[in-house]
C-alpha cells in the first residue's frame, strides 16, 4: 500500500492507474462504517484510494477541530489490512496553498445547505464543498463512496457532481450500526458508558417512527411527537421530516422521505436518520 503525502506523489500515482478507481474520502478515526465503504469500493473497482484529512474549513469556531481524533497509524494499518491500494494523507498546506482571503470562494447550494446541519453549523457545508471538490479534482475517481448517515452532506455532494458536470458516480452506502444499534461515528469515542445508553434513544426513536409508518401512519406531525417523546432525555437540535430536496413534509412520501435527527448527549453531538 502506498501512503501519499503530497499532491505531486498522488498525481504521479494516479497517472499510472488505467482501470477503475474507487475513492473513499475520510477525516480519519476510521471505524466499521468507513470499513464498509472501503470494502464496497474494493469490490467494485480495480483500485481503491482512501484520503485521510481533517478538513479545517468545515469546522466552526466553537467546534472540535483540535480535539478531533487523529489515530493515523491505526488508520493506515486498517487500510493496508483491507487491501487499499493507496492512502492520501496531505498536510493542510497542500490542500489549501493560499490563505483564506486569496482562495477561490466556493459555496454549497443554499436550498440544500442552509437548513438542518447548515443552520446549526454556519459555513460547514461550504467547507465540505471546498475539500471534496479539491479531492475529486486530484483523485479523479470513477466512483466515490459516501455514507447515508450524513444524509444532507450526501445530497449536497450528489448535487455538486450534477451541477459541475463531473464524470464521477456517487455511491451512497447504508448506515452501519453497532451491536446496540447506535450509528457508528468517530465521535462515539467521546461517550462514557452512561451517555452511550442515553444515546440509544436516537435509534430507538427512528425505529419506532419506522414501525408507525409501516403500520400506515403518514402524518409527519404525529410521527414527530412520537419520536420527540422517546428523545425527551436528550438535548434535541432537530427532528425533521423532509423530501430529498430537504423541503419539509406534512405527510410521508414513499421513497422520497428523510427523517433526520441531531441530538446532544453531554457535549457530544450525534446524527442519525431514516430513509423511507
From Swiss-Prot:
Keyword vocabulary terms for this entry: ATP-binding, Cytoplasm, Ligase, Nucleotide-binding, Pantothenate biosynthesis
Subcellular location(s) per record: Cytoplasm
Catalytic activity: (R)-pantoate + beta-alanine + ATP = (R)-pantothenate + AMP + diphosphate + H(+)
Main location: cytoplasm
One GO cellular component term noted in the UniProt record for this chain: cytosol
UniProt pathway: Cofactor biosynthesis; (R)-pantothenate biosynthesis; (R)-pantothenate from (R)-pantoate and beta-alanine: step 1/1
Entry EC number(s): 6.3.2.1
Keyword Transit peptide: no
Active site: 34
Gene3D superfamilies xrefs: HUPs, Pantoate-beta-alanine ligase, C-terminal domain
Biological processes per GO annotation: pantothenate biosynthetic process
GO function terms (MF aspect): ATP binding; pantoate-beta-alanine ligase activity
Note from the entry: The reaction proceeds by a bi uni uni bi ping pong mechanism.
NCBIfam families for the chain: cyt_tran_rel, panC
PANTHER family xref list: CYTIDYLATE KINASE/PANTOATE-BETA-ALANINE LIGASE (PTHR21299), PANTOATE--BETA-ALANINE LIGASE (PTHR21299:SF1)
Protein name listed in UniProt: Pantothenate synthetase
Species whose genome carries this gene: Helicobacter pylori (strain Shi470)
Lineage: Bacteria, Pseudomonadati, Campylobacterota, Epsilonproteobacteria, Campylobacterales
Amino acid at each position: 500500500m502506498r501512503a501519499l503525502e503530497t499532491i505531486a506523489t498522488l498525481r504521479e500515482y494516479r497517472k499510472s492507474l488505467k482501470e477503475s478507481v474507487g475513492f473513499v474520502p475520510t477525516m480519519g478515526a476510521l471505524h466499521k462504517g468507513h470499513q464498509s465503504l472501503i470494502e464496497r469500493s474494493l469490490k467494485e473497482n480495480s483500485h481503491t484510494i482512501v484520503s485521510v484529512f481533517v478538513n479545517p474549513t468545515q469546522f466552526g469556531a466553537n467546534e472540535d477541530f483540535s480535539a478531533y481524533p487523529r489515530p493515523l497509524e491505526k488508520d493506515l494499518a486498517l487500510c493496508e489490512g483491507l487491501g487499499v491500494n493507496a492512502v492520501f494523507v496531505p498536510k493542510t498546506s497542500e490542500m489549501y496553498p493560499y490563505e483564506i482571503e486569496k482562495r477561490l470562494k466556493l459555496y454549497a447550494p443554499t436550498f440544500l445547505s442552509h437548513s438542518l446541519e447548515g443552520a446549526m453549523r454556519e459555513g460547514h457545508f461550504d467547507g465540505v464543498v471546498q475539500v471534496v471538490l479539491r479531492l475529486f479534482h486530484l483523485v479523479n475517481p470513477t466512483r466515490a463512496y459516501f455514507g447515508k448517515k450524513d444524509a444532507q452532506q450526501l445530497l449536497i455532494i450528489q448535487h455538486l457532481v450534477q451541477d459541475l458536470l463531473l464524470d464521477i458516480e456517487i455511491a451512497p452506502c447504508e448506515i452501519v450500526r453497532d451491536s446496540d444499534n447506535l450509528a457508528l461515528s468517530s465521535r462515539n469515542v467521546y461517550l462514557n458508558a452512561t451517555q452511550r445508553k442515553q444515546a440509544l434513544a436516537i435509534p430507538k426513536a427512528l425505529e419506532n417512527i419506522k414501525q408507525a409508518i409501516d403500520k400506515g401512519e403518514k402524518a409527519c406531525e404525529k410521527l414527530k411527537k412520537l419520536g420527540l417523546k422517546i428523545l425527551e432525555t436528550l438535548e434535541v437540535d432537530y427532528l425533521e421530516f423532509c423530501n430529498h430536496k430537504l423541503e419539509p413534509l406534512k405527510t410521508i412520501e414513499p421513497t422520497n422521505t428523510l427523517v433526520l435527527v441531531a441530538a446532544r448527549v453531554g457535549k457530544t453531538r450525534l446524527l442519525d436518520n431514516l430513509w423511507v
